[in-house]
Amino acid sequence: LKDISSKDLRKIIVDAKNRKRLRTKLSTLEVDKGSPLKGKILIQMFEKPSSRTRISFYLAIKQLGGGTLTLRSNELHLGQGGESITDTAKVLSTYGDGFMLRTDSEKKMEDFKKYLSIPIINGLSPLSHPTQVLSDIFTVEEIKKKPISKLNICWIGDSNNVLNSLIAASVKFSFKLRIGCPKKFE
């Protein structure tokens, strides 16, 4: 979230609301009018298991007219004495228009960000889970029927990657956030 302006984050939420409204009469696999991602490929790499993230990204890209290529790190030479992240990032940049990484390594996320020449989306890392928080903001605004900036949000639970992203989002979206974390879960 730190790399995207508050204005652009708000545009993402507004666009998602508009697209959801326009999709009410479309089936799950029908493509949005205008196919904004026609001819575009999102490469997804999962180092951690995923159900919702994988399916959500696949369907979102499909509904926008694009395609996905899903990889597991164990299917690549990456980290197995073969290619470096630098080389892998260069290769992936030639085949895709965007890259989504779900990883258990913050360093790997930063290295891919450094060496890719295409946009990267953090699908989950040890320190952040921005896509989860954006979908949470979308849902809260949809249910409460007002911008999150007009709400007080409370987090009770362990201190984790979702909380880190929620803290960042509270600054970007200007909402009040109260946090309660048990001592053994700091």
Predicted feature residues:
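Conserved active-site and cofactor/substrate-binding residues in soluble primary-metabolism enzymes
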Residues: 4-7, 37, 48, 52, ...
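Short, surface-exposed connector motifs at secondary-structure boundaries
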Residues: 38-41, 91-97, 149, 174-177
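Active-site cofactor/substrate anionic-group-binding motifs, chiefly glycine-
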Residues: 41-95
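Glycine-rich phosphate/diphosphate-binding loop of Rossmann-like nucleotide-binding domains
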Residues: 47-60, 142-186
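Hydrophobic beta-strand scaffold residues
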Residues: 68-70, 99, 120, 177
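Short, acidic/turn-prone active-site loops that include or flank metal/cofactor-
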Residues: 74-76, 124-128, 182-185
